Amino acid sequence: KASLLVWTTTPWTLVSNTAIAVHPEVEYVAMEVTHEETTEVLVVAQNLMDAVKGEKKILKSFLGKELERITYKRPFDYIEIPDAHFVVLATYVTTEDGTGLVHQAPAFGADDLAVCRSYGLPVVNPIAPDGHFLADVPVVGGVFFKDADKALVKELKASGALYKHQQYEHTYPHCWRCHTALMYYAQPSWYIRTTSIKDALLRENAATDWHPETIKEGRYGDWLNNNIDWALSRNRYWGTPLPIWRCENKHEICVDSLKELGTLAGQELSNLDPHRPFVDDITFACAECSQTMTRVPEVIDCWYDSGAMPFAQWGYPHKEGSVEKFKAS
């Protein structure tokens, strides 16, 4: 029996612990540690073992990749997370500090999300959009996420799962207006599948004569090489409304124009201001189930407006002759 010595700077995310990440090519050790009359076996990155107090005896050394998919007991079982809690591999894990084993909560970090998705792990989020734990979560239900740290550390100590707790100074995002702590928060979004044309984008970039030439393989080329699907939607009030209507049965339709919207709604809408709140008042019957269709609440990323404006102001691509006018040479 051994314990994975895992570190985190965000105890509040431990409620959502889904996996433990190790670097596949880093050397790890299982060592017997005796400290204050207690002996236990700990797993830690070899070049970080000096941070562990007590008499140490290495029992075995191995690469991180040998730990892959080994299961473990999570620190809290407050919420259900099915088919999870095993060791995963991640090249972003470092041995500059910590223990070389990193706690994964995919709802609260881009790296965690990408790694856990690659293993088919679920994204479970026990925190509401207002930053408070859901009321039915034991111990910290209804508590603001950062205020939950102390209570959770206390629970870790009581259960014997806490190895060490200390103050650790590090950067953390805060609201620039009110200085409230912020969180990375995974939520459903609408995407443009830009990855489906990634090869074509790279091919056209290679055939483009850039000035200065360094942009071709530098800033722009690097951006194309690291292209991911574009999260188009934004949860704001101001902006171009996402033109998607949905009914209670999840049927959806993307409306192309005010003319089409007027036809669907049976109204003359040529003079409608196509922004919130006015466009949100337009509803119509679903063609598949007759339920009422309402517009989804999201607006579009303003960069979409910026990119479309030079062409859309001249009626592209709907106005006759506009496609030929903007044909690339």
Residue ranges of each PLM-predicted region?
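Generic recognition of flexible, low-complexity loop/linker segments
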Residues: 17-18, 58-61, 89-91, 111-113, ...
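Residue patterns forming the tRNA-binding/recognition surfaces of aminoacyl-tRNA synthetases
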Residues: 1-15, 27, 35-37, 66-69, ...
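Carboxylate/His-rich catalytic cores and anion/metal-binding grooves
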Residues: 28-33, 39-74, 296
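Basic, alpha-helical terminal appendages of large translation-related enzymes
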Residues: 35-39, 57-61, 162, 167, ...
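Phosphate-backbone binding and catalysis cores of DNA-processing enzymes
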Residues: 20-24
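Short, ligand-facing micro-motifs at secondary-structure edges
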Residues: 80-88
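Alpha-helical recognition segments enriched in aromatics with Gly/Pro capping
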Residues: 119-131, 236-238, 255-256, 260-329
